[in-house]
Amino acid sequence: MFEAIYAGAESGGATPPWDYGAPRPQFVEWAEARSLAGGGHAALVVGCGYGADAEFLARLGFRTTGFDFAPTAIAAARRKYPASEVDYHVADVLDLPGEWQGRFDLVVESLTVQSMPPEQHAAATRSIGALVAPGGTLLVLATTRDEESELTGPPWPLTRAEIEQFADGDLILGRVERIEGGAWWRAELSRPGEGPTSSP
């Protein structure tokens, strides 16, 4: 589905509805509120699309990796940012490279899980959580769904219980906000310990 949407956009069709053409404002607001600075820490953007969030992190000084399931999206990101320092990859969130596990001081997940069928949500949250290094942070952005509301999609917005599923293993759920008039979740999780670098 995602490859078809990106390929259609490349052929003159509609821009993917999740693409802002700029870093996602809910992410930028979070970063600015904590004066986020990379300092050479390793960061990863899940489902990076055309790369706006990944490039934002690189400008803040992170050693940034971005991946997307759609090859057309990654090719477009590389064309858009020819001098980029971001390490772009085509990858499946349900089958990520083993060497990525526990490697990243900051992981940003924005709208990827909710774009997947609900029966894949639990596996996707586990896979994403496993990327976080000791001492690292996971930021989750998703649109909201109340437990009693009808489940229709795509996309399939996340309930509070699904946000809590990211706290798998030793990942600790910290602040959870309902922002944008309650339409969005913004959740922050952390993994205890000290990695090769301190947490951003």
Predicted regions and their residues:
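Class I (Rossmann-like) S-adenosyl-L-methionine-dependent methyltransferase catalytic domain
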Residues: M1-W100, M116-P200
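Short catalytic micro-motifs in class I SAM-dependent methyltransferases
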Residues: L111-S115
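A conserved beta-strand element that flanks and buttresses the S-adenosyl-L-methionine
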Residues: V108
